[in-house]
Each structure stands twice: as structure tokens, then as C-alpha cells.
Amino acid sequence: MTDTSTAAAVFDWDSPPPVGGTEHALWLAHWHFQFENPEQLHMLEQLYHDDIVWEVPSRRVIHHGKREVLENYARIFESCAEPKIEPVERYATAQRVFDDLEMTFKLIDSKGFPNHQLPVGTRIAMRVVHNFHIQDGLIIRENGYEIWRPDISW
């Protein structure tokens, strides 16, 4: 049986759980999403393995290495206006974290979302499932599975 856990605890940046356990994997995912913003992008780098691979299969986008991944995140931030994230669920094993969320935003340019499915200017309601692979206590792979829809709630 696989050991899984959901994130109910508040994770302290200065006191990470021991590497190799489910709680450490959840700690990585928690701080990944906390640092996923333009002001703290430099902190995100500390969570990534040097050999990080970032992929969104539905848009056929893949980035290798910290520099490429962080530059891509900077472009994503420039492409979104009024972003809002609503977590759905998160669970983990020691080597994987799955995170399901709803993200709404206005797509203001294409730089951060190559091969996107909806026109620039559209308000987007995107369902995203992240699959984080953990190795040596760091995120070595981040796969994002996106479902793009026009946001009809605006």
C-alpha cells in the first residue's frame, strides 16, 4: 500500500521535514505555490533540482534546467492579469505530489502560454493538475496538465 497524506499542517520554511518522507514532499509543493509569484520567483529556485524538467504536455511545452524554468515562469506572470487560484486537493507519496487547482485569469499575451487554446483577451478558467517528481529532497520534474475553458463566471 502507498503512503499518502494531505496537507493540513502549516509548513515552516525554516524547519523543513526530513528529506525522503511524504511530509517533505508536501512541504516542497506548499512552498512551490507560495513562491509562484513575480516577487518571490528567486525563492522558487531553491526548491528545484539542477536537472529540473518542466512540462505541459497538452501545449507541447518543455523546459530544462532552473534558468529556463524560471524564465518561463516570469513570462507566465507577464501573460496573466487578475490571477486567482483556488486549491482543490493535494496528496503525496515520498517521491510524488499531485496538486489539483482551479486558476482564473485574463490572458493578456501569448509569451507565457505558447500553443494556448483560447484567444488573447479571454478570461480563462483553467483546471490544472500538477505532478511533482521529488529526488534528493528537491523537485526534479514538474508536469502540468491543463484544461483550458473560457471563464463564464465573469
Each model region followed by its residue ranges:
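C-terminal and inter-domain tail/linker signature
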Residues: 2-154
